Amino acid sequence: MAFATIDVTKGITGVTPVANGGTALSSGFVNGSTALNEADQWRVTADFTPAGYVTANWERVDTNFAKIGTGMSESSGVFTFPSTGIWRIDWDTNGKYNGSSREIATRIAITTDDASYGYVTEAGSFLSRTDSNTTYYSVHAQGIVDITNVSTHKVKFFHNTEDTVTADGATGENKIYATFLRLGDT
């Protein structure tokens, strides 16, 4: 096999392309970073019957995970942000039921005055069982919020179902959990 040499500078003005791992940056500088500087995950550790805000049994994920940055703080299911900025929040719920038909709702709620909460997003599902086996569910909600004051902007999570539903908590894996990613500055 023959290899040819190509002169890439002929007919090119301005910046010369660079191959084989070069940066092609002939002048200027790179400022800042696009890497995440805050990432955190929390999960619910015990099974429960969903009936409103999830206020108990939260722990920071400790299985094959290490937070980036300061991380969120939690008290009775209310999460406080470590810094201002644009944040992505994911809320995942999983569970099982033994009834005939069940509606499932999960919501992310935020306050900007440390008092009244409103929903950022809602996700839901309606499950209908056709046999006598246990049926499992998974619902995901996601929102992007602008946190401008860490003293007053907080978030909590809502999960509600009809009866005979069990939300599956766990300590060794994520079944009911929240993910927090700081995407950038306000």
What spans do the regions from the language model cover?
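Short, intrinsically disordered N-terminal pre-domain segments
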Residues: 1-13, 185-186
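Extracellular jelly-roll beta-sandwich "head" domains, especially the C-terminal globular C1q domain
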Residues: 32-186
